[in-house]
Swiss-Prot record:
This is Small ribosomal subunit protein uS4. One of the primary rRNA binding proteins, it binds directly to 16S rRNA where it nucleates assembly of the body of the 30S subunit. With S5 and S12 plays an important role in translational accuracy. InterPro entries: Ribosomal_uS4 (IPR022801), Ribosomal_uS4_bac-type (IPR005709), Ribosomal_uS4_CS (IPR018079), Ribosomal_uS4_N (IPR001912), S4_RNA-bd (IPR002942), S4_RNA-bd_sf (IPR036986). GO terms for molecular function: rRNA binding; structural constituent of ribosome. Part of the 30S ribosomal subunit. Contacts protein S5. The interaction surface between S4 and S5 is involved in control of translational fidelity. It comes from Staphylococcus epidermidis (strain ATCC 35984 / DSM 28319 / BCRC 17069 / CCUG 31568 / BM 3577 / RP62A). Keywords: Ribonucleoprotein, Ribosomal protein, RNA-binding, rRNA-binding. Belongs to the universal ribosomal protein uS4 family.
Length: 200
């Protein structure tokens, strides 16, 4: 299944979650497109709820179905709770960490920064958004990319970096200190529904 490339605003409203991370999509019309008000949502079946939760998380990270399922399967082979492991693996992706550090205003921008070679890990350029970070690894912006407006503006307005990361805004240098805890990740996602979806 190909990565979704349609309107993120419509998709955000349909799923009831801000895919951009800004929340602007839901400010004026916090209901699905094509509906006439917030009370028009159809009651979903158990399968429908599971599917919607899976789509919410997949679109949030901008992944193809194959990438998403592969990561889910890897999480299932790890010790611990499958759903929590899955969420932690997703949050440990390079593009997710670039976004969480505040180097990009949206996850899509973060993915583009990585794709276009603007990001380095431990001093070497990495252009794979799905690159899985390990504790202690250092994320920096390439020297020739440090004056990009998209990066400077993002860092300027960002006022929060999660505790599992460390960020030196002056040098555009971040450290993946440790794996995040579930409580530090999106609370609006019920990953157990995703586990149930793939366990059908």
């Amino acid at each position: 299944m190909a990565r979704f490339r349609g309107s993120n605003w419509k998709k955000s409203r349909r799923l009831g979650i801000s895919l951009s991370g800004t929340g602007k999509e839901l400010e004026k019309r916090p209901y699905a497109p094509g509906q006439h008000g917030p009370n028009q949502r159809k009651k979903l079946s158990e399968y429908g709820l599971q599917l919607r939760e899976k789509q919410k998380l997949r679109y949030l990270y901008g992944m193809t179905e194959r990438q998403f399922r592969n990561t889910f399967d890897i999480a299932g082979k790890q010790y611990g709770v499958h759903g929590e492991n899955f969420m932690i693996l997703l949050a440990s992706r390079l593009d997710a960490v670039v976004y969480s550090l505040g180097l990009a205003r949206t996850r899509r921008q973060a993915r583009q920064l990585v794709n276009h070679g603007h990001i380095e890990v431990d001093g070497g350029r990495v252009d794979i958004p799905s690159y899985s970070l390990k504790p202690g690894q250092v994320i920096t912006v390439r020297e020739k990319s440090q004056n990009l407006d998209i990066i400077k503006e993002s860092v300027e307005i960002n006022n929060f970096v999660p505790e599992y990361l460390d960020f030196d805004a002056d040098n555009l240098k971040g450290t993946f200190v440790r794996f995040p805890e579930r409580s530090e990740l999106p609370a609006e996602i019920n990953e157990q529904l995703i586990v149930e979806y793939y366990s059908r």
